[in-house]
Amino acid sequence: MENMITVSVDNFNSFIRCLTNLKEVCNDADIRNGILRQRTNNHTSVFEIDFTSVFEDNNIALTNLRQKLELLKTFQGQEVEVTINESDDGTGGFYRFQDEHTSITFIAPTMDFMDNKYMDEEELNSIFPASEDDLILEK
C-alpha cells in the first residue's frame, strides 16, 4: 500500500524540531497512525507526540535517528512530498521524502531491530494506571 502526503513548510519544520529534541534520548522514531509514543533509550521516560497534522494516520519508522535527521534537515523551509510504501506482510517498504530538487528514500526497518518501539494504549496504561481515585484535582 502506497500513500503520498504533501507536508507544508510549517508542519515539516515542526516535525524536524521534535525529532531534534528526541535525537539525544532515542535511537529510533516509530510513528503509528500519526502518533509517536515510545520510551527513551534508558527506559526512564515515555513521551507522546501527535503528528496527525503532519502524517495523518500513516506509519513511519526511522532508525538511526541522528543520521536520518541530518539528511531530513535538507528539506527545512520547503514543502515536502512524503511517499509511504508499506508492505502488507511487514517486510520491505520504504519512506521517500522529496522536494522539487531532492529525493531521499529510507528503507522501512524491521521492527524486531528497533530500540525504541511504539507503545500502544494498553502498554502505556499498564505502566501508568490512572483512575478517578488517583486524581489530585477535582472538577
Language-model segments: what does each one mean?
Residues M1-N21, C26, D30-K139:
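DNA polymerase sliding clamps and clamp-related checkpoint/processivity subunits
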